[in-house]
Amino acid sequence: MLGSVKMEAHDLAEWSYYPEAGEVYSPVTPVPTMAPLNSYMTLNPLSSPYPPGGLPASPLPTGPLAPPAPTAPLGPTFPGLGASTGGGSSSGYGGPGPGLVHGKEMPKGYRRPLAHAKPPYSYISLITMAIQQAPGKMLTLSEIYQWIMDLFPYYRENQQRWQNSIRHSLSFNDCFVKVARSPDKPGKGSYWALHPSSGNMFENGCYLRRQKRFKLEEKVKKGGGGSSASRNSAGSASTATAPAATVASTPQPQPPPPEPEAQGGDEVGALDCGSPAAPSTPYFTGLELPGELKLDAPYNFNHPFSINNLMSEQSPAPPKLDVGFGGYGAEGGEPGVYYQGLYSRSLLNAS
């Protein structure tokens, strides 16, 4: 009896364990694991551009593809799939990821190199640099354009805009004067040169900023530039060896003789290069080019923003300082005897 009772008790224990078989089958069956897979597969057609009709049929034949997918941390690692995987998840979630990375790289590709940056010089400075670097100290308009484009690659674009500004600067500034072509140099367009009294616009060869704006009216009112700026005939070349303040003579006779201190101002007034209706022509003829446009002896000044530092590798040879204007100089006289130079020292470092 006791054995039968024990057996019954054992049987009861086993039967009491069998009703809990549902709990045993629940982890074995892949039904709970398929639920997140189905949810993951249903999310793909929402974000991917493919039609939703073909995607439900695609996971059915690809049965063996399910084992690599059931990674337990699918939920937490799901937002990182777009950034971590560049090729697999780029169809659905990789669109904004590479766009953000590409957006960060965009500014690097559009940075303008330093060689093509806009130079910190005004148009008057560019024209002055071009004329000063010319061997004859005068250039045509097309030669000024070409010099600027060769030295600064920035001006190789939008040529019509800045070339108009160059023309306006040449026309509306008294520091630039037109030089007529001589018969021995035929061609199109007149030459442009610097006014003899405009040598103090820039300081020590630095073209970043002008000291003051050059105007002929101010020179006439002040009446003292310390040097002569008049144009003499070829017969007065013999008296040009004296200082400029004593050898200056007026091109037109005047009834009252000018005072010594006001003599320079009257002579500057004779150079009315801006008024086309003035009796004195605004063009320098072949024999009347002033000698002040010639450079003096070079000095060892090396400004960091000087044009010579920019042109050190591009200029093949320094300009000849003793040539002046070549064929435009005085006849039968020494090259440096015609007039005394205005500049106490040259604006450019010819070394």
UniProtKB/Swiss-Prot annotation:
Composition-biased stretches (Low complexity): 228-251
Localization: Nucleus
DNA-binding listed as a keyword: yes
DNA-binding interval(s): 118-212
Predominant localisation class: nucleus
One BP annotation, GO: anatomical structure morphogenesis
UniProt protein name: Hepatocyte nuclear factor 3-gamma
Disulfide bonds: none
PROSITE patterns: FORK_HEAD_1 (PS00657), FORK_HEAD_2 (PS00658), FORK_HEAD_3 (PS50039)
Function according to Swiss-Prot or TrEMBL: Transcription activator for a number of liver genes such as AFP, albumin, tyrosine aminotransferase, PEPCK, etc. Interacts with the cis-acting regulatory regions of these genes.
Keywords: Activator, DNA-binding, Nucleus, Transcription, Transcription regulation
Pfam family of the protein (one): Forkhead
Organism of provenance: Bos taurus (Bovine)
SUPFAM superfamilies membership: Winged helix' DNA-binding domain (SSF46785)
Gene3D superfamilies in UniProt: Winged helix-like DNA-binding domain superfamily/Winged helix DNA-binding domain
